[in-house]
Amino acid sequence: MASAAPGFGRRGRRVAAASILVAGMVTGAGGFAAADPAPAPTPAAAVALFTLTAMPAGWQTRTDLHPSLQIQLDGHATKRADSTAQPVEGTVPADVIGAAAAEVKALAAVDMGTPEQDDQGTSIIDYMPQAPDQDVHLIVYAPEISDGLTDDQKASRKRFDDLFQRLLNAFVPA
């Protein structure tokens, strides 16, 4: 029996040490969770409803690109004439925004083609309503090039460009 007592003692000390270690880990984990709260979700108003971006040829090496126009759900908008220009605040009328939303959804279903020369810039219209499953991202590669495209693709690209210009031209500076 005398030999069993030291084994029980060592086992008891191991259990006690393990219990202290586990208690410390649990307490520490709770402390970390309280110290780093989950980031707050981005408010819907902070995400632009429409973002229009025109990237020139050779854009891959540039770091100064900005959206040409960002439109919020309430019609508030920010426009930049080019990547070096200061942003201008203003609005876009609600009727233009509504028509643009319908046209973006229609354009999502068409083929705008990709020319063989695809390194000649890119135009993008991002439509991001509050329901993320309704997002539409339209991209036209080499918007000035039409070689190798079908007539339907050319017509779809013209509709895209017309919408892009309509939104830019509807901007009213504050």
Stretches with model-predicted labels:
Residues 1-37:
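Secretory targeting and sorting signals
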Residues 2-3, 31-32, 36-57, 110-174:
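Short, well-ordered, aromatic-rich surface patches in folded extracellular/luminal domains
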Residues 36-95, 174:
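Extracytoplasmic low-complexity, Pro/Thr/Ser/Ala/Gly-rich segments
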Residues 63, 88-96, 117, 152-159:
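Extracytoplasmic/periplasmic, Sec-exported soluble proteins
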Residues 71, 100, 104, 125:
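Short, structured motif recognition centered on aromatic/hydrophobic residues
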Residues 73, 94-97, 127-134:
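A short, structured loop/turn motif at beta-sheet edges
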Residues 76, 105, 130:
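Residue-level marker of positions within ordered structural domains that often coincide
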Residues 95-114:
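Charged, amphipathic alpha-helical segments
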